[in-house]
Amino acid sequence: TKVWRDHFKDGDLQASVRDSLNRLKTDYVDLLLLHWPVPEVPLIETMQAMNAVVDSGQVKHIGVSNFTVDLMDEARAHSKAPLAVNQVEYHPFLDQSAVLNACRSAGMAMTAYSPIGQGKVFEDDVIKQIASKHGVSPAQIALRWLVDQDSVVAIPRSSSEAHIESNFKISEIKLSEEDTGRIDALRSPKGRLIDPDWAPDWDK
């Protein structure tokens, strides 16, 4: 579960966790993420609150979402508990090399949300060609490309049983080095699709 931006203060964060546990009818959650960085609240205060809910047994693991490399480093420096993950936008059109390398160095996973680029994979000629060659969908190619990368986890939306089954079938796809290289070449720092007003100063 995630802590939204308006609950990053000490006390507010713990209350948010209690509310989540009550809604989920459980005593603890396996993973708690900070949804977006909030410059108005000192990160040390937020991380101390995150550690408090770990110490209380309400949360097993903590992580962040939409954090830049510098913010990841700051969060780790202020946390006794290790950070498990940084959940960020990642798909074949966005270069997230800086964050991914930082996650690997820190022993963290990088979870890719919006892994099919809000449907852009269905319009891209390179991905469509590779999908046709393998006899699968462009979405399956994008997911295979993501999970082939060390430390990357993809979280596709699954609105139907057919989508869930399709996602599982990516284990049967084997991308060649040429396939991977062609998809790698699509990545760009300018490929970001999700950039709200409160977003941080992204890594270049």
Where are these regions (language model features)?
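Ser/Thr-centric signal marking residues that sit
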Residues: 1, 26, 46
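Acidic active-site catalytic centers that drive phospho-/nucleotidyl reactions
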Residues: 2, 30, 63
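Short, conserved acidic/polar surface loops in the N-terminal third of protein domains
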Residues: 9-14, 43-45
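Beta/alpha (TIM)-barrel catalytic core signal, keyed to glycine-rich beta->alpha loops juxtaposed to Asp/Glu
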Residues: 5, 37-204
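Active-site mouth loops of central-metabolism enzymes
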Residues: 1-11
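CE4/NodB-like, metal-dependent polysaccharide N-deacetylase domain
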Residues: 13-33, 52-56, 78, 108
